[in-house]
Amino acid sequence: MSGKENIRMQKSLFGTSGIRGDAQTLFTPQFCFDIGRTFIEFLRRHNLTDSIGVGMDPRESSPTIKSDLFKGLYVEGVELFDEGTAPIPAINWLIKNTSVKAGIMITGSHIAPQLNGVKFYAHDEEISFEDQTEIEE
């Protein structure tokens, strides 16, 4: 099964702010790998960038999710900027003020500790509903 097919099997990935769910059952190594690759495919269709910044919050599951995302991004040959543990606005600042024009923030924000989330940034902001729909397709 391809990464896209695996992602399509989910009902609706995106909620009001990125993808959120159980850190163990949703954010599996394969899912993180696939969503990383799929985001790069989206960026390339829009001629955006081949460099991407990735940050995370201090949740216990965040480093594993980041590592698995990095594997998918690395396979696509993009230049990776590891922002480490950072506040959510750090990725937005990065894409507005440097040559890096896309980003991913791994954050559960205010949700329960066993959950986590992934937010995607492009076009100088968090991706739009239309962008989310395109990524899911």
Give the positions of each predicted feature.
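Gly/Ser-rich phosphate-binding catalytic loop and adjacent alpha/beta segment
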Residues: 2-137
